[in-house]
Amino acid sequence: MGILSVDLLITLQILPVFFSNCLFLALYDSVILLKHVVLLLSRSKSTRGQWRRMLTSEGMRCIWKSFLLDAYKQVKLGEDAPNSSVVHVSSPEGGDTSGNGAQEKTVDGTECHLLDFASPERPLVVNFGSATUPPFTNQLPAFSKLVEEFSSVADFLLVYIDEAHPSDGWAVPGDSSLFFEVKKHRNQEDRCAAAHQLLERFSLPPQCRVVADRMDNNANVAYGVAFERVCIVQRQKIAYLGGKGPFFYNLQEVRRWLEKNFSKRUKLD
């Protein structure tokens, strides 16, 4: 099958789910608009903020791009885990905690690879996301619990990627005080700074190490993240591959996988 035929087939596969996502956003905008009008008529103070739509031309481009990333991702369940280039993000305490609990001094922007954090004896849970992605940030407390409960048998890595909803792009509507306002990353320093902003609000356990994707977004592309995704690497292979976010981003599946494979060892520890 030729390249053009493959591209056409992928496009035809994407179109139905793309339009269903657009329909969902249109319904969401309609509900929010109705709520806004009701509050306006009642002269509520809640209407002071500017109403912004989710279904915009910028939003549609982002959604389409996310499906392309998912369709062309390199990562496959049971196959070799892509060893993407990333950079260290130092913890608020000024260090990086290794898998054995020791503090290691790291500097923002120090180059490394994703599989540098993988151990032959322990699975590596990799969580991809950004501060401007509400489904990702809403699940960070649950992710922190996973780290605390299973750090004796597994390693954890958070990979900070391109912003899902930058303030100068497809911004999230609503009360800005509830969300992060981060602009599109112009350089690696911007991306590391955004990761620090996330860590300042969400205190992750020291056992979870944090890195940022390179500006070429190679980790995002290899793992087909787009907005958020979680996977588990074991012996350099993909042992678990979570679905495409936001609708199929599911940390409960990660918990079930860890409980199935390591619950007895956790109880002994």
From Swiss-Prot:
GO cellular component, one term: endoplasmic reticulum membrane
Enzyme Commission (EC) number: 1.21.99.4
PROSITE patterns registered for this protein in UniProt: T4_DEIODINASE
Keyword Transmembrane attributed: yes
Lumenal-facing ranges: 1-9
Positions of region (Disordered): 83-103
Cytoplasmic side: 35-269
Enzyme class name: oxidoreductase
Transmembrane segments: 10-34
GO biological process: hormone biosynthetic process; thyroid hormone catabolic process; thyroid hormone metabolic process
Enzymatic reactions: 3,3',5-triiodo-L-thyronine + iodide + A + H(+) = L-thyroxine + AH2; 3,3'-diiodo-L-thyronine + iodide + A + H(+) = 3,3',5'-triiodo-L-thyronine + AH2; 3'-iodo-L-thyronine + iodide + A + H(+) = 3',5'-diiodo-L-thyronine + AH2; 3,3'-diiodothyronamine + iodide + A + H(+) = 3,3',5'-triiodothyronamine + AH2
Protein location: Endoplasmic reticulum membrane
Quaternary structure and partners: Predominantly monomer. Can form homodimers but homodimerization is not essential for enzyme activity. Interacts with USP20 and USP33. Interacts with MARCHF6.
Function noted in UniProt: Plays a crucial role in the metabolism of thyroid hormones (TH) and has specific roles in TH activation and inactivation by deiodination. Catalyzes the deiodination of L-thyroxine (T4) to 3,5,3'-triiodothyronine (T3), 3,3',5'-triiodothyronine (rT3) to 3,3'-diiodothyronine (3,3'-T2) and 3',5'-diiodothyronine (3',5'-T2) to 3'-monoiodothyronine (3'-T1) via outer-ring deiodination (ORD). Catalyzes the phenolic ring deiodinations of 3,3',5'-triiodothyronamine and 3',5'- diiodothyronamine.
Protein's UniProt name: Type II iodothyronine deiodinase
Gene giving rise to this polypeptide: DIO2
